UniProtKB/Swiss-Prot annotation:
Its EC number is 2.5.1.6. The keyword Iron does not apply. PROSITE patterns: ADOMET_SYNTHASE_1, ADOMET_SYNTHASE_2. CDD domains: S-AdoMet_synt. This is S-adenosylmethionine synthase. Homotetramer; dimer of dimers. It comes from the Bacteria. Catalyzes the formation of S-adenosylmethionine (AdoMet) from methionine and ATP. The overall synthetic reaction is composed of two sequential steps, AdoMet formation and the subsequent tripolyphosphate hydrolysis which occurs prior to release of AdoMet from the enzyme. Binds 2 divalent ions per subunit. It is an enzyme of class 2 (transferase).
């Protein structure tokens, strides 16, 4: 997607935890975490819909644990900050409706095996991982900085620095590239829900000074960088009252901001037996280690599975033309170093833990938290040996 030569612009967006789709994602992952904490072998596929005054949870679950769904939903909404009916969503009064079934036995028989190493993939499909040398965490610059802005937008709201802000918000960053390298930011877009009776000038000044200038390093923004803030002129009605939210509708901001491919599968509410999630995490882990090892400045990994089959049906590791090493050499090295059967992915990355609430907002990739094992660069030496460099 991104050209390698010439001058061009590339844009990525991020959303805050109060965005309705992210509210849904957080509820789904909260249910998952509650069950994994009690039963690490829980099988969870939890979807959430949120709208004015209501949260609806549906899905298929097999577990020895128990989740008090109304309590999980309300505590999640409370932590986000929807605490008043004036916002159209209040953790104390919102309705919680659920329809949870058992995991299909037809699916279970394809995943469960007498020998754990033979665990089959939970579905067919392809997953992608990506890494590049544009930022310290080996993420594309546009999505990296869009997430930084979203995190700061939430921080100034929760810390009371800009006490007129409300939970819903979005950010967007456009970078100018020259010959494949990010040079500077051409424009920034920030939209934030706010209290009524606050002037646009107050909102604009506060966001520029407390969010943008305290997030983006001096010199990163072009001299003529345009800043767009709440460009409709009013953003009082937001969150689930302004838009219905659904699990799995922010898959691009969850990953690489459009800089890499996406297989289409969402992450939130799914345990690691679902290769939509574990396969994508493994893809990121591989791509990041390839770049960190110096095998390529840019790397994309595709892994594809057949439901009920342990071994992937295809694996491709590509430098997208950025490396002196061929894609064939990179792919062979990766296959030598990494076991891509679901059981071994889950074991290597320790994915049967209640860690997913931390992944939900501001990107599943590019945040080097202790729980995010897929962000570790601990396979560098093995990859260099396998690639014979």
């Amino acid at each position: 997607m991104i050209p390698g030569k010439g001058r061009y612009f590339f844009t990525s967006e991020s959303v805050t935890e109060g965005h309705p789709d992210k509210v849904a994602d957080q509820i789904s992952d909260a249910v998952l975490d509650v069950l994994l904490a009690q039963d690490p072998m829980s099988r969870v596929a939890c979807e959430t819909l949120v709208t004015t005054g209501m949260a609806f949870i549906a899905g298929e679950i097999r577990t020895k644990g128990f989740a008090d769904l109304p309590e999980v939903v309300r505590s999640t909404i409370r932590n986000i900050g929807y605490n008043s009916s004036e916002m159209g969503f209040d953790w104390k009064t919102c309705a919680v409706i659920s329809s949870i079934d058992k995991q299909s036995g037809d699916i279970a028989q394809g995943v469960d095996r007498g020998n754990p190493e033979d665990q089959g993939a939970g579905d067919q499909g392809m997953m992608f991982g990506f890494a590049c040398d544009e930022t310290p965490t080996l993420m594309p610059a546009p999505i990296y900085w869009a997430h930084q802005l979203s995190q700061r937008l939430t921080q100034v709201r929760k810390d009371g620095i800009l006490d007129f802000l409300r939970p819903d918000g979005k950010t967007q960053v456009s970078f100018e590239y020259v010959d494949g390298k990010p040079v500077h930011i051409n424009n920034v877009v920030v939209s934030s829900q706010h209290a009524d009776n606050v002037s646009n000038d107050t909102i604009r000044e506060g966001i520029i000074e407390e969010v943008i200038r305290k997030t983006l390093p001096e010199g990163l923004m072009a001299d003529d960088c345009e800043i767009f803030i709440n460009t409709t002129g009013r953003f009082v009605i937001g969150g689930p009252m302004g838009d219905c939210g659904l699990t799995g509708r922010k898959i691009i901001q969850d990953t690489y901001g459009g800089a890499g491919h996406h297989g289409g599968g969402a992450f939130s509410g799914k345990d690691a037996s679902k290769v939509d999630r574990s396969g994508a995490y493994m893809g990121r882990y591989i791509a990041k280690n390839v770049v960190k090892a110096g095998l390529a400045p840019k790397c994309e990994v595709q892994i594809a599975y057949c439901i009920g089959v342990a071994e992937p049906v295809s694996v491709l590791v590509s430098s997208l033309g950025s490396s002196e090493l061929s894609d064939e050499v990179l792919t062979r090295a990766v296959r030598e170093v990494f076991d891509l059967r679901p059981y071994h992915i889950i074991k290597r990355l320790d994915l049967n833990r209640p860690i997913y609430g931390k992944t939900t907002c501001y990107g599943h990739f590019g945040r080097e938290l202790p729980e995010f094992t897929w962000e570790q660069c601990d396979a560098v030496a093995d990859l260099r040996t396998a690639a014979k460099i």
